[in-house]
């Protein structure tokens, strides 16, 4: 009898990456009975001390998914590096984890060989953890990169090393309108919508180093769907054997309640009861993600914009935890009283339930890829307001490349400190909620197409089958 399979996930331990990786692991377990166990290796991050509790809560009802915590990294990079060049910090901290992963994997593989009933068949590696490819090679295990971003981002990662061979310097923000012929995009991509880290020397070098390791993987699993990014996936399908095959395995979504230390049941019930009382498609939801912290001046401009438009709204405001300020303290005087009949302000909302509600009509979003996929899944159009990471590129893709969103901003970066004025915000909200050009019908069509992709015979269903057949062998 052939031994059952164990797959090892090496996941970057930030909440967003853990959430998507664990959800993907759940989908594989549900899909294939030959998988005995998926073991997820993770380590502690100084900036995300609660991540391990979050991960445990996500797998609590999953006996075939096992979390394996690694020892603390010795001599981690200084936190100052994170605030200057986050991608450089992430890469350096991951490199320091390589010996710990090597020891853990060696022990796992040896113990499985001794048991004879279970075999480790390969690694699924978060794209921030690509230094682990060398460990997989040492143990003669295939490694697959799991990209929590989209195929457009992968196109950029393919382009970066090619550009670097010609021009070794980081990108220049002052040449923001210079366009790049990034493969997989129909539109040329302006410099100003590329990830902000590419304008900082240390982060730029980290991005290039990460991208240069991609060809060492046996395959790349992308959390996107063919019907959404047809041009990008077609481009990768045409590539020769010098680049790994690309598998569109998305959308990988966590559609059940996610635990949050900031939201108790009464808060959640208050929000959902309020939504029940609102007319269909009347609410604009404003949220910039768990890390989308905005200051008092920007909060005041958004508040003024909401009063200018008169639209009903649900506004989730994340404040700096070190300041211990309530979001209500930062609002203009009298705002809550003036908007009491039309709006609700909270510090955290159950986003999946909110987007699924019939009262939702639009979403002003930071364009984190998880949020984009969730909004598309529920057919809710977006107004783009990116903040950090690759969100500017996501916003560009949604507005210019795919025609699936309304532009508020494409190139906004929260770290630069610009204050977007109320009139501009109000204009985007009006376009989102009332405009004839809002791609509401196309978004609804994409929601249906994404669901079809996951069904038996759909593009993502077939891609996951190809991946599992290659990894485990035989028929699923």
Swiss-Prot record:
Locate the residues binding UDP-alpha-D-glucose: 290, 349-351, 366-374, 388-391
The Gene Ontology biological process terms listed for this entry are: negative regulation of systemic acquired resistance
The molecular function terms in GO held by this entry are:
4-alpha-glucanotransferase activity; quercetin 3-O-glucosyltransferase activity
**SUPFAM superfamilies associated with the record:** UDP-Glycosyltransferase/glycogen phosphorylase
Would I find Transferase among this entry's keywords?
yes
Q: Which InterPro entries match?
A: UDP-glycosyltransf_plant (IPR050481), UDP_glucos_trans (IPR002213), UDP_glycos_trans_CS (IPR035595)
Query: What keywords were assigned to this record?
Result: Glycosyltransferase, Transferase
Q: What is its EC number?
A: 2.4.1.-
What does the protein in this record do? Possesses low quercetin 3-O-glucosyltransferase activity in vitro.
Q: Which PANTHER family match?
A: GLYCOSYLTRANSFERASE
**Which family does the similarity line name?**
Belongs to the UDP-glycosyltransferase family.
* Name of the protein in its database record: UDP-glycosyltransferase 71C3
Write down the species. Answer: Arabidopsis thaliana
Gene coding for it: UGT71C3
